Amino acid sequence: MKLLHLDASILGTGSVSRELSALIVRRLAGDAPDAVTYRDLVAENPPHLTVATLPGAHPVSAMAGPLDAAGQAVRDASDRMLSEFVAADTVVIGVPMYNFTIPSQLKAWIDRLLVPGTTFRYGAAGPEGLMGGKRVILALARGGFYGPGTASVPAEHAEHYLRTVFGFMGIVPELVLAEGLAAGEHNKAQALASARDAVGQLAA
């Protein structure tokens, strides 16, 4: 099994999403850590989307014209991000919710994945995802409560976006959720215990 592990939290050891993503990887990888590719998207800080930063497989990338050495290095990094995702059997992503949505570093990584003819295609019936055999697990941490039945549902643009974008590629992501982390120590402790239990219930 090839496992791709990504983190997008700006926090270090205090990050709940980083803790949960690491727990998931340990459960899945077991005694085969060499099968894991790890990317810290905050440390790598992929640049935002332009025609020059698109992977070479994207048809729009040709509009960038000839690239200098620095531009080619960015293009090569984009190609690597796409190829790592395509090659992975399982992808584990630590996702904090910032300002109602995902971190911009994670969005920049996702922008490298949506390549027509590689991860999806357009057919007579509309778009078709090409990554349906891939497993994606999201370790999502939220300070407030945004689940069904709460008043904040319309403000939730992290989980909803990720389900939409991976669904577009043919993937139904699994979710390990810790929410209400900023609603007092009691709520935080309950959320962490529930999320850790959910990790233990994941199919290895």
From Swiss-Prot:
* Cofactors, names only: FMN
InterPro entries associated with the record:
Flavodoxin_fold, Flavoprotein-like_sf, FMN-dep_NADH:Q_OxRdtase_AzoR1, NADH:quinone_OxRdtase_FMN_depd
Q: Which Pfam families does this chain map to? A: Flavodoxin_2
**Could you give the cofactor binding note from the entry?**
Binds 1 FMN per subunit.
- The entry marks the following residues as binding FMN, namely S9, S15, V16, S17, M97, Y98, N99, F100
UniProtKB keywords? Flavoprotein, FMN, NAD, Oxidoreductase
Q: From what superkingdom does this record's organism come?
A: Bacteria
Q: What's its EC?
A: 1.6.5.-, 1.7.1.17
What's a single GO MF annotation on this record? FMN binding
Reactions mediated catalytically: 2 a quinone + NADH + H(+) = 2 a 1,4-benzosemiquinone + NAD(+); N,N-dimethyl-1,4-phenylenediamine + anthranilate + 2 NAD(+) = 2-(4-dimethylaminophenyl)diazenylbenzoate + 2 NADH + 2 H(+)
Q: Which family does it belong to?
A: Belongs to the azoreductase type 1 family.
Oligomeric state and interaction partners are given as: Homodimer.
State the function annotated in the UniProt record.
Quinone reductase that provides resistance to thiol-specific stress caused by electrophilic quinones.
Q: What is this protein called?
A: FMN-dependent NADH:quinone oxidoreductase
Give the originating organism: Methylobacterium radiotolerans (strain ATCC 27329 / DSM 1819 / JCM 2831 / NBRC 15690 / NCIMB 10815 / 0-1)
